């Protein structure tokens, strides 16, 4: 994705988890936070998949507290769920059914990320 961006930007990473195997734990765990000062800046959250929406909602609340100028969401995949909140400024690659998928960066217990395509895990 970064190879396609033609503007000067700063990139930072965070790590959030909420799954054990194929099931969500219901808890959002922030394993690594960003180190950049994002106050007054335009932020783009890049996500592999939006499933229940709990993780993205957690991140939106977190970043809104940091007084970002704007927050946009880019996701490769979004499951067809109804969320308890409104997603705005979202850019979604593909909307998919309620199935557990792996490959192309998506994992199951830290496996299958390196698959070159996306597959349904049965």
Predicted region positions:
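PRPP-associated nucleotide enzymes
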Residues: 1-122
